[in-house]
Amino acid sequence: MDLFDYMSEKKKESEAPLASRMRPVTLEEVVGQEHIIGRDKLLYRAIKADKLSSIIFYGPPGTGKTTLAKVIANTTSAEFTQLNATTAGKKDMEEVIHGAKERLGMYGKKTILFVDEIHRFNKGQQDYLLPFVEDGTIILIGATTENPYFEVNSALISRSIIFELKSLEKEDIKKLLERAVTDKNKGLGSFDIVLDEEAKEFLADISGGDA
């Protein structure tokens, strides 16, 4: 990356929406979901050890499904690729699989494929991924707001660990609000905003557990 690319990247970061700038990059920054990412939990240990198997995250919007995928992207030694099931076609999937096979064969490097809104893939698209999950060509991470037991291929389900994310608690939302208004690097800390307890309570109440 040359100086121009670096400056362009920094400019994009600074102009990104607040929610994007404040998205956690490490497990320690993630708020809530202690039932799956507490220090004694399987997912926490797997991410820390970089020993992941295929995973499906499901839960309401704003609970951290994509955030956890991004944390994995920031910590894993595997190649991290992603597709959105609402827009990805067969060609996109074939390109990912081709690259994954090359990396595994030439360098022994694994590939993690994150599929957002995986329930949007039709049966044929889900079936296409199955053999490559089975033979280890890819490690699949799917994210969905729907119950995967009804919306995702049963064979993919049987080869994945399912983690349910829950709506954030009011205290979690308040903690995120406080972080956003005090963080001087990524948040609004340089504006010296004072968010009193009543305002935090109100915002936490109307959020509905959606960060």
Question: What function would you assign to each model-found segment?
Answer:
Residues S207-A211:
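The conserved phosphate-sensing helix
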Residues M1-K11, R45-L83, H98-K101, L130-D135:
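Walker A/P-loop
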Residues R159, K175-G189, I206:
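Conserved AAA+ ATPase "sensor/coupling" helix adjacent to the nucleotide-binding pocket
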Residues M1-A49:
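A short, basic N-terminal segment
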Residues G189-I206:
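Short conserved motifs of the RecA-like P-loop NTPase core
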Residues Y44-K48, V115, H119-S158:
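Conserved catalytic/switch belt of AAA+ P-loop NTPases
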Residues I36-K41, A78-I112, K123:
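Short glycine-rich substrate-engagement loop in P-loop NTPases that contacts/grips substrate
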